[in-house]
Every structure is written in structure tokens, then in C-alpha cells.
Amino acid sequence: MTDSPSLESNNKSDMDTPRPPASSHDEHDAAESVSEKQDSATTSPTGKLEPEYLTGLRLGLVMFTIFVSTILVSLEIGIIATAIPGITNDFRKLDDVGWYGSATFILAAAASPLWGKLYKYLNVKWVYLSAVGIFLVGSIVAAAAPNSVAVIVGRALQGWGASGVLGGTLIVINYVAPPRNHPLLIGTWMAVFMMSTILGPVIGGAFTSGVSWRWCFWINLPVGGPIVVLLLLFLRVPKHVKPVPATWKEIILNLDIPGFCLLLVSLVCLTLALQWGGQTKTWDDGSVIATLVLWILLTIGFFIVEWLQGARAMAPLSILKQRMTWSNVIFCLVSYAALYQVMFYLPIYFQSIHGQSAVTSGVNTLPFLAFFALGAMVSGGAIGKTRYTQPYELAGALIMTAGMALIYILDVDSPKAKYIGAEVLFGFGIGLCNQVPMTAVQGFSKPDEVASATGIMVMCQTLSGAYFVAIAQSLFANRMLHALNSGSDHLDVALVLGTGASELQDVFSGDDLTAVIDAYMVGIKDVFAFSLACAAFSVILTALIPFKRLPDHEKKPSKDAMASDEVKASEEVQQEKKVTV
């Protein structure tokens, strides 16, 4: 990577005329990393600017702005669940139902590392605004969709923008807030994200039944407009969080477009195979087998390309090879699998088995939300004090597994006290450990790798959704249909699949309704069993996570250490110039 022309000329001049480190302009810029979180700054004896973080009202305004942006995009993740019946009534495309949710996760997973690179090389504020803009464009496309394909395209654009907003929010927190506040702020952000995601179906149900499913997307415009204004007014990244100098050609090469394309197409192939297999086509159908084979080949190709790309890869080996990173990546993938399945299928349990409306089922998930938020803030505050992360991942995984076991034993006649108790335990456990991997990876990353590391972690979170939500949907549909065909083969399978969970009581009656509810329970139980396995496996995975104390970046290094760091940074820049053509 080369410096800009002005920096390069300065470097040449400095090499010809030796001078003290304190006056070396090029070394000052080279050593200055993208994770320095200053607003105003003081100069150290080596010429580097010491960190001074936002506090008080200024920090509060930035946090408020990015948290509101998070609410905007996270509502759309869950809102589609109750909008689907209205969409299928308009377009009559039952085969596309799975894509309305999957398209968002697929684009979010594939694009997250790209956003991390963009935040590294470009102005943080304008990249963040671009992500919000793409999300709003996707909302317009979905709201005005003349057909089912347009809805899918709109949802994909929403996922693309949402990944930039979510990743950008975590990057901004890392840049502007004091390091010891990061765990609590990330925990609070995670609570806001989860509450918005789960309340999405409630809002979607109100719009779908009261106005139109299109308002699930139109509503983003009057809400998004003021958010853009807030971002323009209050999103202030510290002055010394500067983009890494690079030409446009270098930026494009570092985006790793080949890796992005391979990952995107592989996810599409897997989703197609899981949506066809056992539902619209048999598992031994040629198209199902072909898409599964393509998924395997493309995934292998993706890893080969990532290895060949080296430092330009979407997930650079220099970041992933660190034990603190790869162990938390795996833990994140598996724990999020348990979370997503409960998040999507617990409301289905309430609506299909207990006959609750979307609004009532949303109210019954509030205990889960409340204790998730409590767990996230407890672990965030505790990590801020102790600076250790692994104990909270272990404790959270254990409590989450116990709660998941209680959720698994729920049945058609389970009383309210039973499912509320299970929710509380699971919510508190997943809340304790959910945001910790992000905190750990950011905390142990090198300053110039924070943006890329954040992109990788957001990719893991959304990739877990892309993979495991699709797997859970396939498992649920296949097991439900098998149970239905075994007990009541006279029922119309297409009608059962096309009926929303909250509408079963209106469409079916008598023995048919009983048969459908029993079949739903079989499918839901298998999904919960899968989620329980993921939760239990996450307990084992905590043994891989290092027991280390988070570094305290607020401590000012000694003069000798700063001088040594500056020399190293200058040498790295000179070396990059030699190897970059």
C-alpha cells in the first residue's frame, strides 16, 4: 500500500534531511493508526498524539445517534416474519417465501468484511451514511415491489446496508469511547439490537393487519430521514481517526471482490438446496444435489482465494491466526445459531401452538428481551471492571444451555409459567455471553486492524443467520411435513406451508387443526433440539478461548516505547512502499 503523493514527497525529504522524531511529519502520519480515538489531542515527545476520548454529552449524542440507526435496521430483520402472509397473498409465490428472510442474511454476511475495509480506508462518517442510504433504497424497492422478485431484491439491499450500519456502529464505539467503557456500551448496543429485532414482528403484524405489508418498508423513510439528519449533526469521529492512505486502485484490490463473489454465490447455492430439499423437491433430485455440490466447491474455492489474497483477503490470515480471534469466531458462530433459532421459532411456537396473535406473542417474548438486556449489561459492566472476557462466555454458555433445555421440553399444553421461566434463563445466559466475542476481538486487535476485525465478527454473526436459519427452516419444514403426511395425508401441503403461524386457527378446524398443530410441534421441537446442541457445544468451545486480561489502551506508554513504536511504524511504511507496485 502506498501513501498519498504529499506524504511520499515528505518521506523523501525527511530521508535526505535527518531530524528529531518529534518533527518527522511522515512518521507522525504513518504511526498514527485508525484506532486512535482522540477528539482534541496533546502531542507526546515522539510526535504522536495521545488518546483523548469523547465523554459526557458529546459521547452521549454520538451513542444516541448510532443506537437509533441500529434500531432502524434491526427492526427489519424480524419484521418480515409477520409480513410474509400478506406478501404471499398478493403475489402467490410460495416458493419465494424463504428468500424474503434469507436474502437479507446472505447479503449481510457476504458484505460485512467489505464494509470493514471501507471503514478502514475511507471517512467513517460518510461510509456510515452510505450504509444507511443503501438500506433506505432497499426499503423503497421492497415497499414499491410490483412482484415477488422485487421484494427479494429490496430485502437483499436492506441486508447490504444493514451490515454496514451494524458494523459501523461497533467501529464508532471503538473509536470514540474510552476502552474500559467498550464492554458496557457494546452490551447495551446488543440489548438494543435484540429488542428491536424481536419487536419487529409485532410492528410488522400491526402494519400487515391494519394497513398493508408494504408499510413494513415504507415506515423506514419517515424514520430514516431524521436519522440521516442526526448523523450529519452529531456523528463526530475524533480528528485523529484517519483513513489508511491508499489509492482507489489499492482500495478496490483490498476489497477482495473475488472472495465476496464466491462467498455470496456459495450461500445462494446452500439456501436453494435447503429450500428445495424435502419441500418442493426430493433430496435426491438432480438440482438439489447439484446446488449442494456447488456450495461445497465454492466454499473450498473461497478459502483458497482467501489464502492467496493474503493481507487483501476479506478475512486476513494475520487476524484469524490469533487464537483470541479464531476461538471467538467459532464461539460466535455457534452461540448465535442457538440465539437465532429461538428468536425466530419461539414466536412461531406461541402463534401456532397457543394460537396467539403476532402482538400477543411479541408481548410474551418481553421476559426474554428484558433478561437478555440485563445479562448483556451485567457482563459488559463486569468486563469493564475486571478486563477478563472468557469467564463470562463460559457462565453465559452454561446458563444458556440450561435455559435451552427448558425451552426444548415445551409442548402443546405447556403453561405460561413454564415458557416464561425458560425464556428468562435462556435470555440471561445468551445476554451474558452474546456480545463478549466482539469485545474480546476488538480489544486484542492491533489498532490498524480494528475495522477489519469488526467486519469479520459482524460477518460471523450474520453468516450464522444465513447458514443456521436456513438449516433450521429446512429442518422444521421437513419434519413438520413428515409428521403431517404420517397422520393426515389428506391435508393440502401447500396450504399448510402458505398459512402464517398466527392464522392456523382461522384456516383449519377440528381434527385438521389438531393434526396441523401436532405437526408444527414436531418441527419446532426438532429446531429447539438443534438449538440445544449448539448451546451445549458453545460450552465446550469456551475451553479454546484464552484466559487473558483485556489491554488497557488508556494507559500512556513510556517515551521509549512510543519512540520504538514510531520507528517500527516508519519502517513498515517504507517496507510497504518497496513491495507495492
Swiss-Prot record:
Q: Which residues cross the membrane?
A: 61-81, 96-116, 126-146, 159-179, 184-204, 215-235, 251-271, 288-308, 330-350, 363-383, 392-412, 424-444, 456-476, 527-547
The entry annotates sugar attachment on: N11
Q: Which UniProt keywords apply?
A: Cell membrane, Glycoprotein, Membrane, Transmembrane, Transmembrane helix, Transport
User: Which InterPro entries does this one have?
Assistant: MFS, MFS_dom, MFS_trans_sf
User: Which subcellular locations apply to this protein?
Assistant: Cell membrane
Tell me one GO molecular function of this protein.
Answer: transmembrane transporter activity
Record field: compositional bias (Basic and acidic residues): 24-39, 565-581
Alphabetical GO CC annotations of the entry are:
plasma membrane
Please give, as recorded in its UniProt entry, the membrane topology of this protein: Multi-pass membrane protein
Q: Which Pfam families match?
A: MFS_1
Q: Where is this region: Disordered?
A: 1-47, 552-581
Extent of Polar residues compositional bias: 1-10
Q: What CDD domains has UniProt attached to this entry?
A: MFS_Azr1_MDR_like (cd17502)
Family statement drawn from the similarity comment of this UniProt entry? Belongs to the major facilitator superfamily. TCR/Tet family.
> In UniProt terms, what function does this protein have?
Efflux pump that is probably involved in the export of dehydrocurvularin.
Q: What is this protein called?
A: Dehydrocurvularin exporter
Q: Look up and give the organism this protein is from.
A: Alternaria cinerariae
Instruction: Identify the coding gene.
Output: Dhc2
